[in-house]
Regions:
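Non-catalytic alpha/beta scaffold blocks inside enzyme catalytic domains
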Residues: 1-138, 189-193
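Long, low-complexity segments enriched in small/aliphatic residues
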Residues: 123-193
Length: 193
């Protein structure tokens, strides 16, 4: 997700965003699939948009049922910076909708107009933007946003507490729960290797 955010220019220039959240400096917090924030809610009005409802949904005043990544078409950027299209494996259940549709409907409600008329227009707009960005040299991108310097010089730290429960979808999976239980049973016998 981080590489994709950089590609789209969605970069947090406020280094203290999480600290500001913990210090209750926001009136409204909109979480899109964000389930790993660690903070205590005070007076914030929290809107959660997501598929499986973990920590973010527990804090929410309003829940907008979104689709899991397997239930919506989308684009992903790998660590090489290459964009890849992914197609949905199934349709979202019940009242849940694809993320772009929810955001489009909110925009229509607030501004009396949609951001995009359909998914093709959204994809075309995104690809045109990315093509314009590709024309810029690496040096130009760094000059535009000094945050890139810090990103490229960061040490990658992976805190993997439990592979089988590494995200909200895995935590909800019967198969992953069984895998985790098998791992725990091996540890209790001392035969885990």
């Amino acid at each position: 997700a981080t590489v994709g955010h950089y590609d789209l220019g969605l970069i947090n220039k406020n280094k203290n965003l999480i600290q500001d959240l913990k210090n209750h400096k926001f009136d409204i917090v909109y979480l899109v699939g964000q389930d790993n924030l660690n903070f205590e809610k005070k007076d914030e009005f929290i809107i959660y948009q997501g598929s499986h409802g973990d920590n973010g949904a527990e804090l929410a005043d309003i829940i907008l049922p979104g689709s899991a990544y397997t239930e919506q078409d989308g684009y992903f950027t790998n660590l090489e910076g290459k964009m890849q299209k992914a197609y949905k494996a199934s349709y979202p259940p019940g009242e849940s909708k694809e993320d772009w549709l929810i955001i489009n409907e909110i925009a229509e409600y607030m501004n009396n107009r949609k951001l995009f008329n359909d998914k093709d227009e959204l994809e075309s707009s995104m690809i045109n933007y990315l093509n314009l960005q590709k024309e810029k040299s690496y040096e130009e991108k760094i000059k535009e946003n000094n945050e890139l310097n810090e990103f490229h010089n960061e040490t990658l730290k992976i805190k993997m507490k439990d592979y089988y429960f590494s995200n909200v979808i895995a935590k909800s999976s019967k198969t992953m729960i069984e895998c985790n239980n098998s791992k725990l049973n091996l540890k209790s016998t001392g035969t885990e290797g």
